[in-house]
Amino acid sequence: MTQNWIDAACLDDIPEGDVVGVKVNGKEIALYEVEGEIYATDNLCTHGAARMSDGFLEGREIECPLHQGRFDVCTGKALCTPLTKDIKTYPVKIENMRVMLKME
């Protein structure tokens, strides 16, 4: 599959220590700012249809607003029940203050 870097957001639109939801090529993505780095995952929880961008970000962990399961936003790893499936992550790079995602 061909992967392309896609412009997802302005870096300034992602508050420090917070999460925002964006739509990239029709797909919902959550963007996180953690200790000066930007991370990206699917925006929908793997357990339910909750948006991760509505969740609570604490350090590297995002808590799903529906059932309080937690994911590591850097790796996508599901950290506790009721989650059993990891969340998809996307490579990120910053170019000219734009957040670029590598998507399939």
UniProtKB/Swiss-Prot annotation:
Its cofactor is [2Fe-2S] cluster. Keywords: 2Fe-2S, Aromatic hydrocarbons catabolism, Electron transport, Iron, Iron-sulfur, Metal-binding, Plasmid, Transport. One of its GO terms (biological process) is electron transport chain. Binds 1 [2Fe-2S] cluster per subunit. Disruption phenotype: Cells lacking this gene are not able to convert salicylate to gentisate. Residues 6-101 form the Rieske domain. [2Fe-2S] cluster binds at residues 45, 47, 64, 67. PROSITE patterns: RIESKE. Gene3D superfamilies: Rieske [2Fe-2S] iron-sulphur domain. Coiled coil: none annotated. It comes from the Bacteria. Pathway: Aromatic compound metabolism; naphthalene degradation. Ferredoxin NagAb belongs to both the salicylate 5-hydroxylase (S5H) and the naphthalene 1,2-dioxygenase (NDO) multicomponent enzyme systems. The NDO multicomponent enzyme system is composed of an electron transfer component and a dioxygenase component (iron sulfur protein (ISP)). The electron transfer component is composed of a ferredoxin reductase (NagAa) and a ferredoxin (NagAb), and the dioxygenase component is formed by a large alpha subunit (NagAc) and a small beta subunit (NagAd). Belongs to the bacterial ring-hydroxylating dioxygenase ferredoxin component family. This is Naphthalene 1,2-dioxygenase/salicylate 5-hydroxylase systems, ferredoxin component. It comes from Ralstonia sp.
